[in-house]
Amino acid sequence: QAVFQRFMDPFSEAITKQLDQLGEHEEMVTLEWLLGVLVALAIGNTEKEQERALIFFRLAGLAYTQSQDHLRRFFKQRYAALFERYLRLLCNALPEIPPTELFLRSHFALGSVIFTLQGFTSMQQISQQDFGNPLGLDKVVERLLPFVVAGFRAPYGAS
């Protein structure tokens, strides 16, 4: 928990600060803006911040694939208000999709992001060796974000 908290506390404070700056304009937030802010703050700008983020995502990948009830409770207890605010903004950005579906799509998106970033070093090596294409984290995130946005915007049909 302490490891997650060292990453999540500054991350959640930065997100809260960004959202607070919106003031009364929260209802005008677009999906692209919301996800872009989350990703930019999670990844950071410096090489050190990016390395730290990749370590966090590797740990998150381990936690995500195992039943970690204590971590789920920890996140719920410590970051519930921020997640509820995020979900409210998501609902405003995509009013045609029910909140329960947005909750699921958030988990699908998180899974995609975690899987991609926890294996970034391997993906970088494969891309270089097999395709002669060096990948930087910024380029991967630049391509990952539209993929995640498309997942959120996928048509909803009650099944």
Predicted regions, residues:
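Hydrophobic faces of stable alpha-helices that mediate helix-helix packing
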Residues: M8, S12, F57, A80-L87
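Hydrophobic alpha-helical connector segments
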Residues: E13-F56
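An amphipathic alpha-helix adjacent to DNA-recognition modules
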Residues: Q1-D20, E24, M28, R72, ...
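Short linear capping/connector segments at secondary-structure termini
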Residues: D20-Q21, A60-L62, I126-D130
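Amphipathic alpha-helical segments used for helix-helix packing
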Residues: W33, Q50-Q77, T121-Q124
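A short secondary-structure junction motif
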Residues: P10-A14, Q18, A63, S67, ...
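Amphipathic, well-packed alpha-helical segments that form the structural scaffold of globular domains
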Residues: S12, T16, V39-A40, G61, ...
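C-terminal peripheral helix-coil segments that are non-catalytic and often amphipathic
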Residues: W33, L41, Q77-S159
